Amino acid sequence: MRSGIASLLGAVLLACTPGTSAASYGERVGEHILDNGLKVLLLEDRKAPVAVVQVWYRVGSRNEVLGKTGLSHVLEHMMFKGTETLGPDDYSRTIKRNGGDENAFTTADATAYYAKLASDRLSVALRLEADRMQNLAFAEEQFTPELKVVMEERRLRTADQPIAALFEQIRSAAYTAHPYQWPVIGWMNDLRQLTREDALDYYRMYYDPANAIVVVTGDFDAALVLDEIRDSFGAIPSRRRPPIVRAIEPPQRGERRTKVARPAALPFVAMAFHAPPANGPDGCVLDVSADVLSDGKSSRLHRDLVYERR
């Protein structure tokens, strides 16, 4: 799915800038927990007559096991392939017919779905998200072709990209015990062996209201939207709490190296270091340092290596 790097970078810069109103944003967010465990976050913003609906599930590649890696990302694709009441691609068509835009992404820690549309069409997105939280169709004739789409995505983005392949190996070398070592898109051999039943079991395990967060921001009345969320999601039963990832990565005791041999015009070298938590006091400092050192042609490393030492 399309990347949200620009939006993410904007959020990071906002959080890292002294004197910003990040704290006031937190004070303005309304937090609610429905009876079925669904967490709801609401932020009114009346600058424009639009709204964004996000549904986050606390499941990513870290929840997978060796032999079935890639399930989180495959399931992300299947969420757009119909429910018991909607046909394949009807979700996307409905959002676009209402003047909106939608997408999704999978990470190691979470899978998120979002739609941006006019605020007076907000209820459309809420109903669609509630439907696919509980009624995903999982038709075999949709699963098999979509799995092939994911495999082709892996070929294009990783297998055929030397730099991407190197970073995949770096991740595998950095983690020896924790499932963070899996690539989010999964290992190709695992993808070849995944079945519809694997994905269905994974969906039933993790796509539960008690394992999800609904986030709405934009031009709306929070009290009214909360009522709509209760109407759409409140009756979805919570089946059970999914298992917790308990793996702990042991301390690294020495340098680790990995080498990837691929046809390429130029050699590529990457160095990775263990860093403190991103939400800790040093997280923003490291983000800014990385930008100063290596972000773009004006960065210090680029000027030094390309212009001064060429």
PLM region spans:
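Positively charged n-region of N-terminal signal peptides that target proteins for export
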Residues: 1-4
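Bacterial N-terminal signal peptides
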Residues: 6-17
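Bacterial Sec-dependent signal peptides at the C-terminal "C-region" and cleavage site
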Residues: 15-26
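Charge-rich, well-structured scaffold segments of protease-associated domains
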Residues: 28, 33-38, 90-241, 259, ...
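Active/ligand-binding-proximal structured segments within catalytic/core domains
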Residues: 37, 46-95, 281-293, 301-303
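Peptidyl-prolyl cis-trans isomerase
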Residues: 44-47, 265
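Short, low-order "capping/linker" segments at domain edges
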Residues: 253-261
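A structural supersecondary motif
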Residues: 270-274, 293-310
